[in-house]
Amino acid sequence: MSNYPLHQACMENEFFKVQELLHSKPSLLLQKDQDGRIPLHWSVSFQAHEITSFLLSKMENVNLDDYPDDSGWTPFHIACSVGNLEVVKSLYDRPLKPDLNKITNQGVTCLHLAVGKKWFEVSQFLIENGASVRIKDKFNQIPLHRAASVGSLKLIELLCGLGKSAVNWQDKQGWTPLFHALAEGHGDAAVLLVEKYGAEYDLVDNKGAKAEDVALNEQVKKFFLNNV
């Protein structure tokens, strides 16, 4: 990273170095490194909050959507994955707001990322501001698949309640969120999907298996069948 001193300073949380570098060479603000990232990507990633605020103060007329890295991640994607709500808000509450539904190269939205990391407050903020719960990634999965996989009851309720998510959407292997909940051993999440949100447990995947057939173990399977 020696060719990218500002990026390095952001990673190492060297605030005065960042100020000094930008004062001497303002064009470094939007310089891309070998990963296609601008300095803001790294300050957000390394949670260098003071530096992030400083960089944003210099970027009032910059649309963050115009700066995806080589994987299609903008600084806002990173913020939602890291999960600090105040940082997410600081990147969103600007004259040029980021597109909440912008996807990465893998078809992943900020909501997919926040849900997958169990960041409830960030996920709620995104949905309240209009993020779609129905965008499918390259595996044909919507955010609810991820909520079910990590077994978060709160996120399932958020996505199905406030978000009005589809419940029986099948991914590329024919798995609905219910399959993922059972496969990861989250019997309580599976029961919630069926009992409160009407998930169909008789659907079969591409191999002809039902959700109960892919349960992590017999204990999870029995718990599920005894409660639906």
UniProtKB/Swiss-Prot annotation:
Name the record gives this protein: Probable 26S proteasome regulatory subunit p28
The chain's coiled-coil residues are none
PROSITE patterns with a match to the protein in the record = ANK_REP_REGION, ANK_REPEAT
Output one GO BP term: proteasome regulatory particle assembly
What is this protein's function?
Acts as a chaperone during the assembly of the 26S proteasome, specifically of the 19S regulatory complex (RC) and appears to have an overlapping role with RPN14.
Q: Name one GO cellular component term.
A: nucleus
Q: Does the keyword Chaperone apply?
A: yes
UniProt-listed SMART domains: ANK
MF annotations from Gene Ontology: proteasome regulatory particle binding; protein folding chaperone
On assembly, the entry states: Interacts with RPT3.
Q: What else is known?
A: Present with 319 molecules/cell in log phase SD medium.
Name the keywords, alphabetized: ANK repeat, Chaperone, Repeat
Task: Give the species this sequence originates from.
Answer: Saccharomyces cerevisiae (strain ATCC 204508 / S288c) (Baker's yeast)
Q: What is the lineage of its organism?
A: Eukaryota, Fungi, Dikarya, Ascomycota, Saccharomycotina
Q: Which InterPro entries match?
A: Ankyrin_rpt, Ankyrin_rpt-contain_sf
Where the ANK repeats fall, as residue ranges, is: 1-30, 35-64, 71-100, 106-135, 139-168, 173-203
Q: Which domain of life is it from?
A: Eukaryota
Which cysteines link up through disulfide bonds? none
